[in-house]
């Protein structure tokens, strides 16, 4: 099994329709919202720090995940529209996709939020180091680590630190 993480830019992949159908069958509407927002231009994951990635297994789209500016928290980014096909779960694809997005975020900020839609998603995000923090529309926070020799540290003035409870 070969896993390839690709940046999605100019257009959504054709296979997104299959992903959306599978998500809808599971009761999830966030992939349909991704398609709708993309088609009308509301969200193309093209602002500073934003990114949309597709996870491909042996050339087939297995999942998708994005990072957008977190509007409820100054300087933070938010994981969005994250979905892995049910048949592809448990193979490390979601973890690889999430870690690629977190690695990207390190150049832009020190806090990433996510809204875990169910208990399984909450366990997944917590396994990556996200901490429960249910406010401002998100359920979890992740504090990214910067090192003093990290060139991204110069971006810290634009970011926030997690608030105390």
Question: Which residue ranges define each predicted feature?
Answer:
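Acetyl-CoA-dependent GNAT
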Residues: 3-75, 80, 104
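Conserved beta-strand-loop-alpha-helix junction that forms the acyl-donor binding cleft
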Residues: 89, 112-123, 138-141, 145
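Conserved acetyl-CoA pyrophosphate-binding loop and the N-cap/start of the following alpha-helix
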Residues: 87-100
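Conserved N-terminal entry element of GNAT/NAT acetyltransferase domains
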Residues: 1-14, 18, 147-165
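Hydrophobic adenine-recognition pocket in adenosine-nucleotide-binding enzymes
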Residues: 82-84
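Conserved acetyl-CoA-binding loop of GNAT-fold acetyltransferases
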Residues: 126-136
